[in-house]
Amino acid sequence: MINIEKVKREFDMYVSNFDKKQGRIKLKIEHIERVAKISALIAKDLNLNEEQTILAETIGFFHDIGRFKQVEMYDTFSDKDSVNHAKLGTQILFDENLIEKFDIEDKYREIIKKAILNHNKDRIEEGLTKEENLFCKIIRDADKLDIFYVICNYDFENAFWYKDFECESISEKIMNEFKSEHKINYKDIKNNADEISVPFAYVYDLYFNFSLKYLKERQYLTKYANLVCKKFTSEKVHEQTMELLKCILVSFHQTYF
């Protein structure tokens, strides 16, 4: 079984190589620690055993391990402007053998690798084992849940790469995709107003009832919508944001939100 206390110690040792006082480094450390906790909560809610719960928590600590090098090398969290942080993370862990410091048994390694590689994809790849697929779902949900926390509690400019809060509107293409398909094509995102739709679309990509309840209890969707309306200056953007929120409420018949 994985020694989760050793995982925590070695994670702390690894991130000590970076400037923890730097805003984005600090943000990412805190995000990773929360995602690990949420992953364990999801596993427990699914009645997984102790070994599986610890594995889920461990994946939480590893899922964004590539972010630190990404910021150091490219000064951004934007994959499109740098590198795929999930692939970078697996290179650091497995190709550069950082994984050896954590004393992770071989039987867990492929599950961990698949979970990291799939946590930031549009959808989980096909051909995975049942166990690999399960842990991919857990980390994807846990990551999205804490992204809402980050959005609602950190500056947009620091947490992401929002710079322009004067965009006039979310594109009609994005709005139509969201309302008709309950998803968006990331290639269609052209500006920061279009980016607004991304967290809303996350809701349709959550796998577990626990995750929907978690969002509701913390009122993240309403908080996010209100924050967007506070940050962006365009009345059109405000209207569209509330339209996206309403679409979610209708879709779920307000069962959760």
What are these regions (language model features)?
Residues 2-5, 9-12, 50, 87, ...:
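Generic alpha-helical secondary structure signal
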Residues 3, 25-28, 80-85, 104-108, ...:
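A generic short-segment signal for beta-strand/edge and adjacent turn/coil regions
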Residues 23-29, 33, 37, 41-49, ...:
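Divalent metal-dependent phosphate-bond-processing catalytic cores, especially two-metal-ion Mg2+/Mn2+ enzymes
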Residues 68-111, 122:
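Hydrophobic/aromatic-rich structural module bridging two neighboring secondary-structure elements via a short loop
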